[in-house]
Amino acid sequence: MESEKDCVFCKIAAGEIPSQKVYEDDRVLAFKDLHPVAKVHVLVIPKKHYRDVWEVAAADPDLLAHIVEVAQGIARKEYNGSYRLVFNTGLDAGQTVFHAHAHVLTGERMAE
């Protein structure tokens, strides 16, 4: 697991690593995923480092609500408001970057 100083998302939020920004304010940054798995695949991250969504929820519930609101706004702009919002939490759930982030996915129905 990376430390905060080694966190790639912290570096993106600080502008040390470039990204394709979709939205930014003083609390969050949204950018296109480098390896999209949907027509629209955007990541919404808090600028402050939290390991996962549970840390955000415990420390700052208003920030978690803001992340969801930003995701909804992106989905409305990019794909008429139909979207999936995914938080992978923990290694076994597929979390590969241990900085809380939401995946905003649009464009395809999930297989039944």
Please identify what each model-predicted range represents:
Residues M1-E112:
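HIT superfamily nucleotide-processing domains
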